[in-house]
């Protein structure tokens, strides 16, 4: 996801395809060019700081201080400088975050989604001391991945069979609507006519 997201930020394409589904000239190599731009910067955070990566998931993670763990696979291109290529070290890094999770959205990476699901606690304790299932959503275009996650013991997972791009677009739309509604309700007109926040 990170490479495709960064390619979209830098070149406006994903695997060389534009948002309207058209192939771009030399598009088959754009993901490698994106990786190389980040490698030249030194890290994803530095690529954001230098204005190379200007929007997208990874940009938002860096700007808002959201931790992320990128682990490799045997067929990785690149990889990006932030990718942990040692499988055991990658699992350890993932475990440090999954134990603190209050919600998980697993998107379009079968092996990583299943591995993460296996590390997640089934239940979490809220601030008020109540116990609840950990909200877990698995998004993939393959029903196999969604089913496999539940079959491997992540019983609390809710599966969404769709492509990741559509899911992310819809998720963003609803999050933005929710934020707009909260902003609107936070602005109240005081009896004197003054606006308070």
How should these model regions be labeled?
Residues 5-7:
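Extended, H/D-rich, highly charged conserved domains that either
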Residues 2-3, 17-104, 109-197:
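C-terminal functional extensions of proteins
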């Amino acid at each position: 996801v990170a490479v495709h997201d960064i390619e979209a930020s830098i070149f406006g394409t994903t695997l060389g395809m534009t948002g309207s589904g058209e192939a771009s000239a030399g598009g088959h190599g754009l993901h490698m060019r994106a990786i190389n731009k980040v490698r030249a910067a030194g890290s994803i955070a530095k690529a954001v700081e230098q204005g190379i990566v200007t929007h997208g998931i990874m940009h938002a993670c860096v700007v808002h201080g959201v931790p992320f763990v990128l682990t490799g696979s045997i067929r990785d291109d690149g990889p990006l400088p932030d990718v942990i290529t040692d499988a055991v070290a990658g699992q350890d890094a993932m475990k440090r975050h999954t134990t603190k999770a209050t919600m998980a959205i697993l998107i379009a990476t079968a092996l990583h989604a299943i591995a993460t699901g296996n590390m997640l606690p089934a239940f979490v304790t809220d601030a008020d001391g109540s116990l609840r299932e950990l909200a877990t959503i698995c998004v993939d275009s393959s029903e196999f991945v969604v089913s496999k996650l539940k079959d491997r013991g992540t019983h609390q997972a809710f599966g969404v069979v769709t492509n990741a791009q559509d899911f992310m677009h819809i998720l963003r739309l609803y999050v933005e609507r929710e934020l707009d509604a909260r902003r609107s309700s936070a602005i109240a007109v005081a009896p004197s006519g003054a606006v308070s926040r």
